[in-house]
Amino acid sequence: MLRVEFHCHTIYSKDSLLPVEKLLATCRRKGIDRVVITDHNKTEGAFRARELDPERVIVGEEIMTTKGELLVAFVKDRIPPGLPPLEVIAQLREQDAFISVSHPFDVMRKGHWELADLEEIVPLVDAIETFNARCFSDKHNQQAQDFAKEKGILGTAGSDAHAAFELGRASMVLPEFHDADTLRTALAQVEYRVSMSSPWVHFTSRYATMRKKIGIGIPAYISK
């Protein structure tokens, strides 16, 4: 069985200062066997991490569509933000990616989904995120869990970590998998190991965003 972190960010995200190397070291220390790196609208950090630890790292992306965010694993090519969700999903299907929906009911997040828009895409995606450790209220996770049960769709859980101490806060234990198809099969046997993060973690993201805007201590290879 594998312990999986399905939702995390690196310094390549606009609101994280977590170096790729530190993320990988923390995953090893915490016994995280697979990590899906889902930077905001970018894949450079995930590809760099996979070069360093190809067995542990799965390339992902958190993509902002015109309606809400999608959380994707086994990405081959970056999808830019700002496209309609149906267009993004079609492009991801061409890549044989696994598609989940980020924190769909967390109305405190910019990337949450209106119910009508979520209903439209549910038949076209593989899962929705039924537990996100950074949700401002656990009721948003409960709404996602109830919705997934009603629709008979798989659920993913993730820490949404933007800092090293958050990694593994919400993880999944799964049988071996190696691509989107085997991940779908494995999720039918998922065991969730989850706990909520303090709302204070969001200040780490705001601090990272501010640092990048003014360019303090940010490596030259990272765009603001």
Where is each model-derived feature located?
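Charged catalytic cores and adjacent phosphate/nucleic-acid-binding surfaces used
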Residues: 1-25, 44-48, 52-59, 65-81, ...
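Divalent metal-dependent hydrolysis catalytic cores, especially in the metallo-beta-lactamase
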Residues: 25-41, 97-100
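Short, charged N-terminal beta->alpha structural module
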Residues: 90-97
